[in-house]
């Protein structure tokens, strides 16, 4: 009888150990992850040592993490130059690739190694994922019993240099706050290229000062719903656009999260919104009626590439963007 009960007990213990490893849910999955015994307990306050770096950029990365941590948990992190007193250590390791990092969480301390600010930033995103979900969500809670981390050793580096996400705002306008939220989510998942689709047949979303009608006319259409099949235009005035000030603000916001913004401008096709704004030199037939498109799909009302003025328009739009 004892033997019969002993074998299931061994299997149960083994399954619990496997489950512990499975519970370390990180996205993207690190290249190497080892789970150890014990947990790192935060307490109400702790000290951190941050390696010096040009422009103090590593410290700025950590200050952003500190702010998020305190807002969600109330835990205060102060600085120290003495490693023996530090419970969080950010240490330079020149041997690591630019976006790579090592993260070692033990019962006594959290140690992060990287060679560039981006590596430290990605390590801190992983650290947030190891914490309770409300930290990722930025939602405050007073239950300090939750504030601990599993003991782990992680070595990680991206498989791909270009890790992109595309958002189509030509067809539907989302606005500045939503774009920042998208950038926040990209940063959590260590994506680094935001493909921002800003023009389409159905709308032009970026201010071009040399061609103001692109947003005065091209940013607006007479239906929120795009017609398709049995779905008809609803007649609602709909649209929006970003000023150049908005664009600069969003670019700066993304840069702090190591995300490069790639603006997408469709020329000569997918351009009916632009044609509607300047039919006199963009349209293949200026005598036709041209309006911002109300349909799903792709319009055949394209920019006339045989017109030198249209080619000059394309050049000047790109020049103003850059």
Set out the residue ranges of the language-model regions:
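Local alpha-helix boundary/kink/capping signal
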Residues: 14, 34-36, 269
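Feature activates predominantly on carbohydrate-active enzymes
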Residues: 96-301, 307-322
